[in-house]
């Protein structure tokens, strides 16, 4: 079983185009994939195609990864966060969004099975829909942040950027040596995945990207504010936002634009 998963992942990965690639094979086709739940083997994901979808226009591809105890519907419906982490509204029809379902309400990524799932979804979606293959992104909170970090490690050549909200090394880090645009957002009083660990994740990709070392600033306790640190001299951008809060799916409160605005701006500038 394990060998089968690994072999399937290698075969799918060999068909994926890097962030330096062109448009997907789905461009110009009449699509067959529709909004809603889709299956790959024994796994599921929810797909959201813009209402104004144009098969001749390449779209961004954005993965929204749920937290521990959540599921794909939590991301789509906006449980404790804006729907789709606030990115659907900011994309204004320019992105196709995917919310995969983790196994056992999480992303243990055992033997790389969750990375393999993402690979398979990319292939299925891009074979049918028009995607700019240089414009794939992933974001998630908590375990979803950990899974986004795992994708940064294992699929830096396939994704342009990730935004890790209150993440940790909880889905592994296969590879982890290639540069990728990396945004970390973390509460200074996080009791679940400590703030310093979030800084360590960002520092890893700052090193991969050849950035100058930087002091990561923090807001005052009780200030209800945030401090953004942009690393300098990087081959690919690295930023870290420290906010006054704990382990929060929506930093500074549901409806606060901090994380959605920062993530969208970072993705588009990456």
From Swiss-Prot:
GO molecular function per UniProt: feruloyl esterase activity
Protein name as annotated: Probable feruloyl esterase C
Transmembrane parts of this sequence: none
Cellular localisation: Secreted
Enzyme superclass (EC): hydrolase
Glycosylated residues, chain numbering: 23
Organism annotation: Aspergillus flavus (strain ATCC 200026 / FGSC A1120 / IAM 13836 / NRRL 3357 / JCM 12722 / SRRC 167)
GO cellular component: extracellular region
Organism taxonomic ancestry: Eukaryota, Fungi, Dikarya, Ascomycota, Pezizomycotina
EC assignment: 3.1.1.73
Secretion signal, residue range per the UniProt entry: 1-21
Keywords associated with the record: Carbohydrate metabolism, Glycoprotein, Hydrolase, Polysaccharide degradation, Secreted, Serine esterase, Signal, Xylan degradation
Function: Involved in degradation of plant cell walls. Hydrolyzes the feruloyl-arabinose ester bond in arabinoxylans, and the feruloyl-galactose ester bond in pectin. Active against paranitrophenyl-acetate, methyl ferulate and wheat arabinoxylan.
Keyword Transferase tagged: no
Reaction(s) the record says it catalyses: feruloyl-polysaccharide + H2O = ferulate + polysaccharide
Gene encoding the protein: faeC
Similarity field: Belongs to the faeC family.
Pfam families membership: Abhydrolase_2
GO biological processes: xylan catabolic process
Highest taxon, organism lineage: Eukaryota
């Amino acid at each position: 079983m394990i060998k089968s998963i690994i072999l399937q992942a290698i075969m799918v990965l060999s068909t994926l185009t890097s962030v330096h690639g062109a448009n997907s094979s789905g461009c110009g086709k009449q699509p067959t994939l529709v909004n809603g739940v889709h299956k790959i083997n024994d796994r599921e994901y929810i797909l959201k195609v813009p209402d104004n979808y144009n098969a001749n226009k390449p779209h961004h591809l954005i993965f929204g990864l749920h937290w521990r105890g959540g599921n794909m519907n939590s991301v789509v419906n906006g449980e404790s966060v804006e729907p789709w982490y606030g990115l659907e509204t900011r994309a204004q029809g320019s992105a196709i969004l995917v919310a995969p379902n983790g196994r056992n309400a999480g992303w243990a990524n055992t033997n790389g099975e969750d990375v393999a799932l993402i690979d398979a979804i990319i292939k299925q979606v891009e074979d049918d829909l028009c995607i700019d293959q240089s414009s794939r992104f992933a974001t998630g909170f908590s375990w979803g942040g950990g899974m986004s970090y795992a994708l940064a490690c294992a699929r830096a050549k396939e994704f342009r950027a990730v935004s890790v909200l209150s993440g940790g090394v909880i889905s592994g880090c296969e590879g982890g040596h290639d540069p990728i645009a990396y945004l970390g957002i973390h509460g200074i009083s996080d009791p679940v995945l400590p703030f310093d660990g979030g800084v360590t994740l960002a520092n890893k990709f700052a090193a991969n990207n050849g950035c100058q070392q930087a002091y990561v600033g923090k807001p005052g306790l009780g200030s209800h504010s945030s401090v953004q640190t942009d690393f300098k001299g990087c081959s690919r951008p690295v930023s870290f936002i420290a906010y006054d809060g704990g382990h929060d799916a929506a930093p500074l409160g549901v409806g606060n634009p901090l994380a959605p605005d920062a993530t969208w701006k970072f993705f588009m500038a990456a």
